[in-house]
Regions:
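Active-site nucleotide-sugar/metal-binding loop of Leloir-type enzymes
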Residues: 66-78
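Catalytic-site signature of metal-activated, phosphate-bearing donor transferases
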Residues: 62-69, 88-211, 215
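Acidic helix N-cap motif at the loop->helix transition within catalytic regions
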Residues: 14-17, 38-47, 91
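Short, well-formed alpha-helical segments that are part of the catalytic scaffolds
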Residues: 7-26
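A conserved acidic beta->alpha catalytic loop
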Residues: 22, 32-45, 56-57, 83-86
Length: 358
């Protein structure tokens, strides 16, 4: 089996060595450089990659991806689309060869999009940018997707993992105009409508965000419960930012009903009522959050909902309500998840003293 990695790059010199080391085992690496002014091109070539330079104007990620795919030799069996800030975990080739049975056209694998402060997994989901050489192309100006007009045979690839270690200083300023372009090109695309609404929220354009996210929810193709619930949560964040906590709570309750197996909406309700010092409601939604024990692997998962936060909020709410035994249990559970957190240790001590004072 001939396996090839292909990528696009611009001014990513700091990632070259790590990127190429993780690609060890590939039959080749092709990179389309789109205008680096640092040493990216030279370093990649020194490390063994085939690199070509080309200006993409006007800039679109799908055009760049399609041009980079053209660099992959025609006789390759399997292509891996990888960015310079991504890392293939050791053993990837063996895992891929074991799972790629005859007739397979596309592979799904664990993608770790973010990491916590200690390097542990943050947001994780299954990605699908491993594909057969022929019959595929990229579409959408940003948040591009891999498309095919032919029948697909997909396989999950156990043991294949890609970690994303981005440069937090890198600008994403091009995303908003490209998302606006994507929606103009295909106004019925629910995925892009959701992304555009989220991007407006990131930019604190609250009114435009709410309007766009409402458009997403109204699209007949917007049926994925997790993504619909995320749009509702983002609407709630906009409402809260505008000082309308009543509407924020309304939309978060709707989100919790839309995706009852997801922790994120009840966790945000917990946080909302904590900020409002409505302790009974804060405790109720913390308990609702903790009742959900199976975590989905989708890109909208919030790691905070699966950390110490739900127990922490529950402990504080119960302390205010005079439920000291329950508060102490919750505070200890929070501390067990973050044993080096001094504030959580202080909370345990405060609640223990309150309990002893009864």
């Amino acid at each position: 089996m001939k396996i090839w990695v292909y990528a696009i790059a611009k001014n990513e010199e700091q990632f070259c060595e790590r990127f190429m080391a993780s690609c060890a085992g590939a039959d080749g690496v092709s990179v389309l450089d789109t205008g680096s002014t640092d040493g990216t091109v030279e370093q990649l070539r020194e490390l063994g990659a085939h690199v070509e330079s080309r200006e993409i104007a006007p800039w679109r990620f799908d055009t760049a991806r399609n041009e980079s795919l053209k660099l992959v030799p025609e006789d390759v069996d399997v292509c891996i689309c990888l960015d310079l800030d991504e890392v293939l975990a050791p053993g990837w080739r063996e895992a891929l060869e074991a799972a790629w049975t005859p007739g397979t056209t596309r592979g799904r694998y664990l993608y770790v999009w973010s990491h916590d402060a200690n390097g542990g997994d943050g947001v994780t989901f299954y990605a699908d940018k491993i594909h057969s050489r022929h019959g595929y192309h990229w579409r959408c100006p940003v948040h591009e997707v891999l498309m095919t007009d032919a029948p697909e045979v997909q396989r999950v690839i156990p043991g294949l993992r890609i970690d994303h270690w981005p440069d937090s200083r890198k600008s994403r300023a091009s995303y908003l105009p490209l998302l606006e372009l994507a929606v103009r090109e295909d106004p019925d695309n629910d995925r892009n409508m959701h992304y555009l609404g989220r991007e407006y929220m990131f930019y604190r354009h609250w009114g435009e965000a709410v309007e766009t996210l409402m458009r997403h929810l109204a699209l007949p193709t917007a049926t994925w419960d997790a993504e619909r619930a995320a749009s509702m949560r983002y609407i709630a964040r906009c409402c809260e930012a505008l000082g309308d906590t009543r509407s924020a709570a309304h939309w978060l309750v709707r989100a919790a009903e839309e995706a009852p197996t997801q922790r994120e909406a009840p966790y945000e309700l917990t946080r909302l009522y904590y900020g409002m010092e409505q302790w009974a409601l804060c405790r109720y939604w913390a308990m609702r959050t903790l009742h959900i024990t199976e975590r989905d692997n989708n890109y909208m998962t919030d790691p905070a909902a699966w950390g110490s936060g739900p127990y922490d909020y529950k402990a504080v709410a119960e302390w205010h309500l005079g439920l000291y035994d329950e508060a102490l249990d919750a505070a200890r559970a929070a501390l067990a998840l973050e044993p080096d957190n001094q504030r959580l240790q202080n909370n345990v001590d405060i609640i223990r003293r309150s309990n002893n004072a009864q």
